[in-house]
Amino acid sequence: MTARRARLTAVGWETDLVIESAADDPSPPAGSEIRVAVEACGICYRDIIDRDGRFPFIRIPITPGHEAAGRVIALGPDAKDFRVGDRVASMHREFCGHCRACASGSPSLCEFGASLFGLTIDGGYASELVAPERAFYALPATLPAPEAAILHCTFGTAYRGLARLGELRSGGSVLVTGANGGVGNAAVQVAKRLGAEVIAVVRNEKHVPHLMRLGADRVIVDAGAGFHKQIAQPVDVALDCVGPPTFNSALRSVRSGGTVVVVGNVAADRPQLNLGYVVTRGVRICGSAGAARHDMAELLQLHAKSPLSIR
């Protein structure tokens, strides 16, 4: 069957994606590259802002999509991590694998400018995807492709933010803003499986029943930025999945010596930061995006023990 791909030929919503045929006789993967037959590719908020043209470095034309899952169908001569037939999912980006950040397990901070699927290199809206093997991680045979495709972007982001940067442990407590979104839903579930007390924050009460089913111990409905006033006991970690509108209240929700992990930045405005409050309370503020291979391996172990609702 002829391979096909979607192409974005201009940013903005006036131009439709173009479906075109790829080469009938594609060149074999080079070096450590692998060729993956794509079984599913997710659509998330970043795909929307990619198409909006909010990233000036986007390469046009390009094949969008950074949440791909599928099966390895060909290997480059230097590929060692996978075999033909293995199930894999993409890591959002291609990175060098050798710099200090990559070597320390933080490939999203690659010092040599990681290439981004769907922005600077062709992504997963295609029959096949070719990239270095380090841009993929292994999947279990039992995880359906549609769930596997979105696992890294939502649950991987939540897991790394909570377990790695937030150092959330059993018996701890966490507050999640934007809990009704994809990463927020994932964070509620991940935090609960890590043994934490979970407070979710949303703007609309219609989300309350669903979040309680996912494991939230309490859901605060607050359309403003004063939800910290509704918390009796400051939390160990706040995972801010929104950005400027919720940041300051999230900051004031954590205990002295606690951590605010920022994974959301959906608003263009800038938060007002009281540095004196940060200094005197000893609060850590971390930014995080995506996850590393070892994060995904741990997350998949967590899922095997207590299945997550991935959707």
Regions found by a protein language model. Name each.
Residues 194, 242-309:
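Glycine-rich phosphate-binding loop and adjacent beta-alpha segment
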Residues 229-238:
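A short acidic, Gly/Pro-enriched loop at the edge of an enzyme's catalytic core
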Residues 25-41, 54-103, 140-143:
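Glycine-rich beta-strand-centered segment in the early N-terminal region that forms part
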Residues 201-205, 222-223, 241, 264, ...:
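N-terminal Rossmann-fold cofactor-binding loop
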Residues 141-224:
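Mid-domain Rossmann-like dinucleotide-binding core that forms the NAD(H)/NADP(H) cofactor-binding site
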Residues 37, 94-178:
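NAD(P)H dinucleotide-binding glycine-rich loop of Rossmann-like/cofactor-binding domains
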Residues 1-69, 131, 219:
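Short N-terminal strand-loop motif that marks the start
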